[in-house]
Amino acid sequence: MKTIEEKPFFLFGMGAREKLFYRNGALVSCSDGSAVFQTETLGETILAPEYTVRMETKKGVVTVIEDEAGVHLTDETGAHRTLTASPVRLPDFAGHPYRDALRILHHDILINIIGGKPVPNFFVYKKPWYRDGAMMTMVLEKTGNLALIRDWAAALDALYDRNNAGIEESDNLGQLLYILAKTGNTDHPLIPKAVEEAKRRSADGALTGLSDFSEHPVYQTKWLKLGLEALGLDTDWVKVPAVPDSYSPLFWMDGHKEEHAYGSYCENYPYLSWAAAHTAGFTMDKEHLAALEKPGYPISSETEASQAQYELLRPFLPAYADARHSAPHTWHAAEMFLYLTDLYGI
């Protein structure tokens, strides 16, 4: 995994809770930088898999912990207060060979739900992306947290997110249908419009148009089929084309295998590599799997993304801003989480 030299930090505020940034004895609001708590520390321990920070001070120990109810602070005197609260489900993943990694990756997903909206990274992306949102939906379904984004999905009013330079990306249609299906919005008015739009944009049953500035008919059409299937709608008219598509290795959800899908690791966009390794039959290299046995924080990331607003990181993570790097990142976290749970169970 790509690492950028930054001072240790941790994020609190999974799901609908206020987002809080911890570093070096200070806990601040991510929305305006205002101080929530601050103390001079003699030392600190960040226990990322336990969603816990322990601060050693001259007067004793301060603990901040996040659980299924909220974020709680206990000061040196033992006084306890809840800083922000709303329910989330936090499986322990006990017995899983990558238990600690799954705990952190799940945190990476939940921390990036802001105002009920699933975003790739809440610092540098202010709008949800349907692709990342659909991948997050898969994780939320596994962990019983779909309710966190149900209202956002119900309020959707556009067939495309138009986040990539305003382009109406064809894979969005299937991702939208999938999100609506899984969040229980099965009578949403966008569903018939999306089906009609997909037929309009199809040639011989395969979607046309762009995704990430290129044509990817196999990838786009497979997303469409998955979304329709999730809703129980007719897919007989959908025909996945037998043509080369560099994004075909990213779609493992239909169970197909491409033996040589995984090549070299992509440090800037690691979600591509984890998806391809999944499609290739769980072939992620030993180096990157070994890094998850004793994971640091954060695990997931993205670098040099064309639409990310990296300067928004500067008040909190200046080294990340300089490197045009954001972490955690939900598409990456979702691909890793789904790889590990599909391989070993949950």
Residue ranges of predicted features:
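Low-complexity, Ser/Thr/Pro/Gly-enriched N-terminal "stalk/linker" regions
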Residues: M1-P128
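An acidic intrinsically disordered interaction segment
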Residues: P91-H107, T137-A147, G184-V195, E302-Q307
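Aromatic-rich carbohydrate-recognition surfaces in CAZymes
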Residues: K127-A134, L140-T235, V240
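Well-ordered alpha-helical scaffold segments within catalytic/enzyme domains
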Residues: S86-D92, D132-N145, Q175-H188, W223-D234, ...
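Polar/charged alpha-helical tracts
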Residues: T63-V64, H72-E76, A147, P189, ...
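Non-catalytic carbohydrate-binding regions of carbohydrate-active enzymes
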Residues: I4-F10, M14-A16, V240-I346
